[in-house]
Regions:
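A beta-strand edge to alpha-helix "cap/lid" segment located at domain peripheries
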Residues: 1-6, 16-19, 37, 51-130
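N-terminal hydrophobic signal/anchor transmembrane helix of membrane proteins
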Residues: 11-15
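A short gly/proline-enriched turn/hairpin at secondary-structure junctions
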Residues: 29, 33-45, 56-60
Length: 130
């Protein structure tokens, strides 16, 4: 369906959206009916839901900086591996968390479904059990 170069461009732009601090910029990478579930939790649905999810991360880590570590793709399926750093807003402790998202892209190369993963126990440990 897609060439790896185009997928890499999308991943770089998605990373820039997270680094902009704008929940709406993050949400624009999703289909209007897209969704994301993190660590098998309840999914956020639609762009408004995606923006709400991103806003939660920005609230917890206002100086969040995201790096795309690697991208793998096969057809319309993408693995986006990332690391974010920043300072937890409540405890003021530094964070460095790695994880990944598994994307299913639609025909317009928007994320239809994302399954996100990171070690929540490690996050809690670094944040000081905030």
């Amino acid at each position: 369906m897609n060439d790896h170069g185009k997928i890499r461009e999308i991943a770089e732009a998605y990373t820039a959206a997270w680094n902009s601090g704008s929940p709406q910029a993050v949400a624009e990478f999703y289909a209007t009916d897209g969704r994301i579930a993190i660590n098998r939790g309840e999914p956020w649905r639609g762009r408004a839901g995606i923006a709400e999810m991103a806003a939660g991360f920005f609230s917890d880590v206002p100086d969040l900086t995201l790096v795309c570590d690697k991208v793998h793709s096969a057809g319309n399926h993408v693995a986006y591996l990332w690391t974010f750093t920043g300072t937890h807003s409540k405890t003021k402790k530094p964070l460095s968390i790695s994880g990944w998202e598994e994307w299913d892209l639609d025909a317009e190369l928007k994320v239809k479904a994302s399954r996100g993963w990171y070690d929540a126990n490690e996050y809690a440990r670094q944040a000081g059990d905030a």
